[in-house]
Amino acid sequence: MKDTLFYKFIARPFVWFWFSLLYGCKVVGKENIPKNGRVVLAGNHTNNWDSLMLISVVPRQVHFLAKDALFKGFPGFFLRRVGGIPVNRKIHDKDALINAKKTLEMDLCIGIFPEGTINRTDDIIMPFKIGAVKMSHDTDSTIVPFIITGEYKLFRRNTRVEFFPGYKIKSDDLTKENEKLMKKISKELKKNK
């Protein structure tokens, strides 16, 4: 399935222009994102703008999992049109996981922040929930780790996103695989501090 017309011709160009003009973003490792097939982009969550910033730099449509509270009014309209998947974070939202897996089974790309929320702690990273690894494993998708560094400050141009080589989750020990993903992202964040 190709990018939706709304995404390709309206949402992505608008978001790209807005982010390029106001924030700028250095992108490293874009070649590590497969152009086709099932992909789970998994990385740290620093700010409310992270999803939109990734929409502006990833060369294919990204279907983000986002808290259901964001799916109201105009933001909700926009999120639905760009393929957003609402998640009720108060419960173990099986419907969100089912929708995300269906999206991957159509050979599309999912974006997820395994921390589950914006990291407002002093820790470099918060513990990961297992959803990204489980979805990747269950759908035989390539998981592509990424990090976001810098701050979204107007006209500062210090935001950076780096994508690392993707891999398939072959082991059934998902707890161990989740720790491996978390350690990889944590290690890269420490290098970039």
Segments from the language model and where they lie:
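Membrane-anchoring hydrophobic helices of lipid-metabolizing enzymes
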Residues: M1-V40, P75, G83-G84, I98, ...
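Non-catalytic C-terminal accessory region of glycerolipid acyltransferases
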Residues: M1-K2, F6, L97-K193
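A generic local structural motif
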Residues: C25-K30, W49-S51, F71, L97-I98, ...
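A generic structural signal for alpha->beta connector loops
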Residues: L22-G24, Q61, R81, D107, ...
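Catalytic core of membrane glycerolipid acyltransferases/transacylases, capturing the structured
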Residues: A11, K35-I91
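Generic preference for hydrophobic
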Residues: V27, L41, F64-L65, G84, ...
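Helix-adjacent hinge/juxtasegments
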Residues: G76-F78, G84-G111
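A generic structural signal for well-ordered alpha-helical segments
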Residues: W18-S20, V57, L79, T103, ...
